[in-house]
Amino acid sequence: MGCGASVPVDDDEIDPFLQDKRINDAIEQSLQLRQQNSKKGVKLLLLGAGESGKSTVLKQLKLLHKGGFTQQERRQYSHVIWCDVIQSMKVLIIQARKLKIKLDCDQPNNSLIPYKQIILRSDPLKQIDADVAGGTDFLNDFVVKYSEENKNKRRLKSTGTTDIWGKDDDSNINSDAINQALESSLNKDSEQFTRLSIAEAIHKLWKLDSGIKKCFDRSNEFQLEGSADYYFDNVFNFADTNYLSTDLDILKGRIKTTGITETDFLIKSFQFKVLDAGGQRSERKKWIHCFEDITAVLFVLAISEYDQNLFEDERVNRMHESIVLFDSLCNSKWFANTPFILFLNKIDIFENKIKKNPLKNYFPDYDGKPDDTNEAIKFFETNFLKINQTNKPIYVHRTCATDSKSMKFVLSAVTDMIVQQNLKKSGIM
């Protein structure tokens, strides 16, 4: 009899239970790696210039993964919005005169005169609980936004150039300055009116005074709350002292972000820590404290602000400042290997704007069709992608941060991408 060469036999072929054990061990190891990675967590940094909508993105994350807003938050926004709706109408009346727009309520014997007088003599701070609205932070922001003294101070400090790391510091107004400003410019000649009479006055001026609408159409030329028209349309809701802000009210409302806020979310078994840093110049010097161990940067840009100037310096275009800011962050040593997610936000407002204010007036190198929204957005997408001088990926999304339906889709895509990248780093995928 001949003899053949022996062939080694795999133990798995002899013992199927051993094969099952190896498979189970591999699965267990994979699960342990995933668990360790989820414990380590994901750090998402929200950045962008002031009023870009990044805090609205955070609000949408709360709606999706935190069960929405508390009763306290709803009360707070009701107070803040009531103040802003009154002050926004005051701003329109004052700015119309500066822009030499004829107001019906300024004409002799016009039936709208009493409504104008109510608005100009109203003091919203006498009608709310400042502590519920945010205490000192709220009063600080209110004075910064609406005090003529602070507007004049900003004009005097204006350089007309981008100052991305911000040496201006409007946020550090002390309590004496707050009290002085409130007693002088804000409370001057004020009277106590009922909320209903104020709401009626705002409603009449908004609906019937053609000059107010003309002034609103030119609001890119001065500083006005971005949701002022929404406030005016719903003014009777906000006039109700028992009214609790809806989700949409809160998404439309604005409370200035000061410092750096941290919010934790559990998304797909991963711990997400989202850091929202104040975007105005005076806040940016604080950013450096949250640059370490960042998984991804979410940079929010209000594309609709191509024709507006900064609140901090009315000689600087908001879009130009955002471009320089994005450049400094994207190409920073801190984020050399950190993926960037770019939200081109407020596209709904942008679509309406470019039909009235051609993009080429502000960006002469744009050679697309004047009223082609898609072409105009692509212009910005291309220019922002060109800024990247590294090999890291940049993911661009077109967003309307106040639209919960579309943001649910976008944020799901973003969090899925971040989770997948973390799994790849762990060797699980």
Swiss-Prot record:
A Gene Ontology term for the protein's cellular component: cytoplasm
Residue numbers spanned by region G3 motif: 272-281
Keyword Disulfide bond: no
Cofactor(s) needed by this chain: Mg(2+)
Disulfide bonds: none
CDD domains assigned to the protein according to its UniProt record, in alphabetical order: G-alpha
Region (G2 motif): 249-257
Lipidation (N-myristoyl glycine): G2
UniProt keywords, alphabetically: GTP-binding, Hydrolase, Lipoprotein, Magnesium, Metal-binding, Myristate, Nucleotide-binding, Palmitate, Transducer
Region annotation (G4 motif) ranges: 341-348
Residues where Mg(2+) binds: S55, T257
Region spans: G5 motif: 399-404
Lipid group attachment sites (S-palmitoyl cysteine): C3
Pfam family, one: G-alpha
Domain G-alpha per the UniProt entry, residue ranges: 40-429
Annotated segments matching region G1 motif: 43-56
Gene Ontology MF terms: G protein-coupled receptor binding; G-protein beta/gamma-subunit complex binding; GTP binding; GTPase activity; metal ion binding
Binding residue positions for GTP: E51, S52, G53, K54, S55, T56, L251, T257, G279, N345, K346, D348, A401
Region (Not present in other G-proteins): 125-197
Any single biological process term in GO: G protein-coupled receptor signaling pathway
Function comment: Guanine nucleotide-binding proteins (G proteins) are involved as modulators or transducers in various transmembrane signaling systems. Involved in the mating pathway.
Stored PANTHER family: GTP-BINDING PROTEIN ALPHA SUBUNIT, GUANINE NUCLEOTIDE-BINDING PROTEIN ALPHA-5 SUBUNIT
Record's subunit section: G proteins are composed of 3 units; alpha, beta and gamma. The alpha chain contains the guanine nucleotide binding site.
Family under the similarity heading: Belongs to the G-alpha family. G(q) subfamily.
Annotated protein name in UniProt: Guanine nucleotide-binding protein subunit alpha
Originating organism: Candida albicans (strain WO-1) (Yeast)
